[in-house]
Amino acid sequence: MSNRVVDVNSKKTGTSWKKKLMKIVIWSLAMLSFIAGLVLLGLVAAATISGSKNLPTAEYKWAGCENLGKCQIDGFSTPPLVILSFDGFAKEYLERRIVKSLELIAECGVKADRVYPSFPSKTFPNHYTMVTGLYPESHGITDNYVFDPNLYPELLAMRKHEAKEFYQAEPIWSAYKRLTGNRVHCLFWVGCYYNITGYMPDVSPDYNQELPLKERIDTLIGWLKLPETERPALITAYLHEPDQAGHMQKNVNQELEEVNNYIDILMKALHDENLLECVNLVIVSDHGMQALNNSIEVETIVNMDGLVLSKGVVARIHLNETDRSIDEVAGEIRCKIDGVKVNTINDIPLRKHYSKSKRVGDIIIEGKPGTSFYKSETNLGDHGYDYHNENMHTVMFARGPSFLQNVTVPSFQNVQYMNLWLYLLGLEGTVDNNGTIGFFDSILKNPPIRENKWDSMEECLNFGSAEVLQCDKAEGHDLKKLSLHLENCKEHQNLPIYSKNNCFQSYCENSLIIHKNRQDVRKGVIESLTFSFSRNQSVFENSFSFVNTKYSIECPKLDTKDNFFTAGSEAISKLANAQYKFPSSFMKSELISSLLSLKDETIKFVDIWVPLSIKTDEYLKHYGKLFVLSGLAVDRNLDGIADDEESKEPTHFYRILITCTGNWLSTNPPLCKKYSDTKALAFVFPILNKKTTMDCMDSDAILLDYTSTIEDVENIASFQFQIGALSHQQNVYLRRNITTSLW
């Protein structure tokens, strides 16, 4: 019995063991299949990310500058222009030293110190800016998602909709076709399919992100090898990396290697086909990339009834079907979250050029770098931030017969590109844009000879001798001495500004810029300030206002004597016509006298005038001398351009500061012994009597946010700024210099 039991158990044990073994085998095979599947998916994903099929490692056989500019093929008397964009190539990527191909291009060509995207730093707006030279507010593509109820009742994703009416400007391919009739080809560039000008590229295949990079190269080379009558004179091409890797914050270095390999293959193909020295190649990008670390959902803070919300690292709110005002809605989130700025189109800084079009929205919400106004499990990096964020900065490299060798162009904003394209295609000056003609002259082999404009501003009509007419009573001043000074001082005929609408009044070291229509409030003051320890540090204490009887025999009628917009503190600076009664939210004049003597670190202001006055005074102490231009401007339609109509109420206040870090040659006009010693800083502030996001910003943050270029000031104040002793190129760089930090 026991033996039978043993036999039975032995059979069961054997059967059980075989079943277990079979399960192990099946499980193992299943696991192997699963792992193989994961590997395959990984390979497919990698191929999808890069869009390439095992590109060979870069060899750089094309490198070297021995034959630079020596095209050996007939039919290339005018070099074709190839513009190649790598989406999301941050300037920071260059520091990783992975994309050696770009370094080699720069050795034989040119590069930019850095390129600032336009605001917001998104793909669609900036790609269209690069080919139109217009800010997004002007060309219509104000974001990757656009809301325009006149065209469509919902928020539209530009990448999904054939909405040609959204593309309002003329891109370079359209201008070239219209003006020359020659051929243009486009490979996936934003707007190639939808612009409404009527002049489309001759060849523009449908967007296909899966098209392998090798095939894209073959396409470009094939186009360049066409017979001269069929060959495009302009090619624009777009590649979606390294942007996708940047968004995922994974395999960025691997993707940069792919980009490097791609450029190497392209350059080798150009070299092998003897095209390298016959083509002007410009490599650009639209923006950088920022790692995300914070998410805020606007819907949980703001009542969204009747509103349209566009999400992103910049959130935009459109008032659509609501009776609430812009200020009411903005007030629901303004100053409620640390580090979040809530602007309306009325108070957003002019330098962002984001108020002209209704498509920008009514309220623009920005957070600190790393903050997004949406939730995503996969998006670990993004862009769209203010170009003051250095992670948004990007690159430009160029090589070809028209470019100098091993030259760096100073930092610039991407609105400048259009004038470069027009010059390289022989069409300079034919299309208006937001760039400045001549900005890129320093990188070109044969730039045009450009001269400064020598227009001079007229002196205002005068009535006789220069004497002081005191406009408010003050004791202890020697009016005769001041009158003698006005009568005998040298007049400044060589002022650094010109305007056909204005004239100047000479006040010795200073000049008053007056609108020829005396009823118009627009005016400015030029001051040459020198610091001395005996200088009265209070702007208004013991000073008095006056006019020069050479230009006026009566004082202006104002309700206050305190609201001067001059920077100096001496009596000579208290020009009565440099008075304007600012709203209390702009200037609390009764505080200035007692506060200017305090140390900056002990004060935190939310008004504009006080921190600006303190900062100007601080700079004067530090540098010893300052050239200051301050004034009032009118721009009611918020397009950044001075209004033509007469106005008695200014909308903006501006100030330009210029100093020398070395020796001065002149203070008015401001001129340093060495141009490289010149420092310039400009501001444009809205004049508003309402709550703004400035109420919850510290003084330095306010000042930095409302910096601008000198050209921005020129446009809104309706004058031209130029220092005659500087070259045309130096004046352009000075006027278009972008400030990303205070002095």
UniProtKB/Swiss-Prot annotation:
Q: Which InterPro entries match?
A: Alkaline_phosphatase_core_sf, DNA/RNA_non-sp_Endonuclease_sf, Phosphodiest/P_Trfase
Its record classes its membrane topology as: Single-pass type II membrane protein
The active site consists of 123
**Which protein family is it in?**
Belongs to the nucleotide pyrophosphatase/phosphodiesterase family.
State the GO CC annotations.
membrane
* MF terms in GO: hydrolase activity; metal ion binding
Q: What is its EC number?
A: 3.1.-.-
Glycan attachment sites: 195, 293, 320, 406, 434, 536, 737
- Broadest EC class assigned to this enzyme: hydrolase
- Cytoplasmic topology: which positions? 1-23
Q: What is its cofactor?
A: Zn(2+); Ca(2+)
Per UniProt, Zn(2+) 2 binds at 243, 247, 383
Know the name of this protein? Answer: Ectonucleotide pyrophosphatase/phosphodiesterase C27A7.3
Q: Which domain of life is it from?
A: Eukaryota
